[in-house]
A protein has these predicted regions:
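Membrane-anchoring alpha-helices and their flanking helix-loop junctions
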Residues: 2-400
Length: 400
């Protein structure tokens, strides 16, 4: 990848560059519109239905289905859909304003993202890890000193999700209007279709003023931060209810916090990924991070609050270690990809520069041999048993 230009050079290039081309669709118009309209209409009620199932139906899909069948889909959803309350709005705006203030005020190193399609170089302030630490310390301190009880968040969770569903939809309308009337850079443009523009977004790097990056706020400081805060909330709520926290909840919370910590440790790397450098700020990214992440990603803990599972020390430790290993693999894959880009491919593999493939010939040969042997075995069985082999394959699709 080309070395990023300076911000001044990028600004000059952006002034001359035409507006970025709108995002292209890879499917037919029918599939594109059907999929977008389906997600726009089905995701909001699914969030509420998931909350109801986890909290009020003991996680039973059958009970949730019976409720909808008894009352009808629309009336059933209307009956379980909580109305946003003032408490819910206060929690959302309090959290959002706190995170926005941290994003703007905390110190951080200057980070330049990859060159955009229009030649712009987005500039960020890398203070995510500091904001994450301040958020958790503040949240736990408010609980510890009796200033705010996080259990209130769980008690009003349905109302919070309902407010987020509607509020985030309005926010996406704001982004659509802003993209038309006041884009932040030349990396913006319209496809000419309202549905596509609203769903995918108008701007790649929308900002309020010069320094407040909207996608960093929605994706990182609200979405990912709320994941960690809600994980802690569920833990505290279970402790308040039972006087103890089940080992299953401890493992769940620990793994979520480790993952989110990894995310903020690596936040500047995330700014080089598809979510930030390719996907525009629309319903898909912004509504997803504002609503989908805090509701769907935290749902295991949401269920465990009222349904503690006692794993036992050995199983709990095994799950914890396996989870940590998976998180490390995920992190190292991202790290290697970023390192490869940073060095323009001139990086080491297992401490050495990649040079020769012949020492790996045995692995390559054995892979080809095993695939060939599996195919020949399959052909022989098909020839020998005819239609009965096909019946067997249909019943046992995964065979050794």
């Amino acid at each position: 990848m080309a070395k990023p230009r300076s911000a001044a050079a990028a600004a000059a290039a952006a002034a001359k560059a035409p507006a970025a081309a709108p995002p292209k669709t890879v499917h037919s118009a029918l599939v594109t519109y059907a999929s977008m309209l389906s997600l726009l209409s089905l995701c909001p009620p699914f969030v509420i239905l998931l909350w109801y199932t986890m909290v009020h139906a003991d996680g039973s899909v059958v009970r949730a289905y019976e409720h909808l069948r008894e009352h009808g889909v629309l009336e059933g959803l209307k009956a379980i859909w909580p109305m946003p309350t003032m408490v819910a709005w206060k929690i959302i705006f309090g959290f959002g304003l706190f995170e926005a203030a941290l994003q703007l005020l905390l110190p951080g190193k200057r980070f330049e993202g990859p060159v955009s399609p229009s030649g712009n170089v987005p500039v960020y302030k890398a203070n995510g890890l500091q904001a994450y630490a301040v958020t958790l310390i503040t949240y736990l301190s408010l609980w510890w000193f009796g200033i705010f009880n996080p259990a209130i968040v769980y008690d009003h969770l349905g109302e919070i999700y309902s407010a987020l569903v509607f509020g985030s939809f309005v926010f996406c309308i704001f982004l659509y209007i802003k993209g038309h009337l006041a884009p932040s850079s030349s990396d913006s443009g319209s496809s000419g279709n309202v549905i596509i523009d609203f769903y995918w977004g108008m701007e790649l790097y929308p900002r309020i003023g010069k320094h407040f990056d909207i996608k960093v706020f929605t994706n990182c400081r609200f979405g990912m931060m709320s994941w960690a805060v809600l994980a802690v909330t569920y833990c505290i709520k279970q402790y308040e209810m039972n006087g103890r926290v089940a080992d299953s909840m401890l493992v769940n919370t620990a793994l979520m916090l480790i993952y989110v910590t990894k995310f903020f440790w690596w936040e500047s790397g995330y700014w080089c990924t598809m979510d930030i450098a390719h996907d525009r700020a629309g319903f898909y990214i912004c509504w997803g991070c504002l609503v989908w992440v805090p509701s769907i990603y935290t749902s295991p803990g949401m269920y465990l609050v009222n349904h503690p599972v006692n794993l036992g020390p050995q199983l709990a430790l095994s799950i914890l270690l396996a989870g940590i290993l998976c998180i490390y693999i995920n992190y190292d894959c991202d790290r290697q990809r970023q390192e490869f880009r940073r060095t323009n491919g001139k990086c080491s593999i297992w401490g050495k520069a990649p040079s020769k493939f012949l020492p790996y010939f045995y692995v390559i040969f054995l892979t080809i041999l095993l695939f060939d042997r599996a195919k020949r075995d399959d052909d022989r069985c098909s020839s020998k048993y005819g239609k009965y082999w096909k019946m067997y394959c249909n019943k046992v699709p995964c065979r050794d």
